[in-house]
Amino acid sequence: MNVQEIAAFSDGAVGGNPAGVWLGDQPLGRDHMQAIAAELGHSETAFAVPEGTGWRVRYFSPAMEVPFCGHATVALGAALAMAHGNGVFPLLLNDGEISVEGRDHHGELTAALQSPPTSHTALSDAQLMRYLSLLGYQHDDLSNDLPPALIHAGADHLLLPLSSRAALSRLDYDLEAGARVMREDGLVTVMRDPCCGRSARNRSLIFDYRARLSACAMFPPIVFVERTRSCVRRSRE
């Protein structure tokens, strides 16, 4: 299986968010890609083959195909730099075109991601009540600094800003119910931002029902950022 596992957003060989990356000469079938993603078990795996002057890319979680994944694209940039040298690589996605820059600085890998177009819309009262009920929250648990919203940067996400870390620690939900709601609403991740002071407002917690995660991972918010640089590491061929 011609798959690499690469951790994006790492500091050298420490930490990061792992993704699978498959590079090939000919595209695989959907079922084959889905099986590889399920076997790897990472939240996303990127599959890329040459097309024209760039690369045709598709993303799969262990359970389904998704339209885009930022950290898997960062990992893909590192893999392309290792395989083809430093450069900017055009990427053709299911729903648009972007690029990723990959560079190998004497063994230290970096990638610069061009985000797909971003947008956001406010939640309706009915939507908000549905999500609060699912997650066991009340209106009083929400922060007044940032409105709940549906946000988009290549894929659709739900953002629920909370008033405190204590509220975040009370998070409780039924995994099957969460997966059902996300499938019905076309959501890829649910983000909760514990807005308890200025320092906390620069970080978001992301929960991924598709991978059935029992823990959460911290990421700097990049939804409304046009480009972001990230260190990556190659963990296994």
Q: Language model features by range: what are they?
A:
Residues 35, 54, 60-184, 209-225, ...:
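Acidic, low-complexity central loop/insert segments
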Residues 6, 24-25, 51, 62, ...:
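Fold-independent oxyanion-binding glycine-rich loops
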Residues 19-22, 46-48, 98-102, 158, ...:
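Short beta-strand scaffold segments in enzyme catalytic cores
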Residues 1-59, 105, 153:
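ATP-binding N-lobe of GHMP and related small-molecule kinases
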Residues 41-56, 177-217:
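Conserved phosphate-donor
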Residues 14-17, 69-70, 200:
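Short glycine/proline-enriched turns and hinge-like loops at secondary-structure junctions
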Residues 9, 45, 88, 147-148, ...:
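Short, acidic/polar N-cap/turn motifs at the starts of alpha helices
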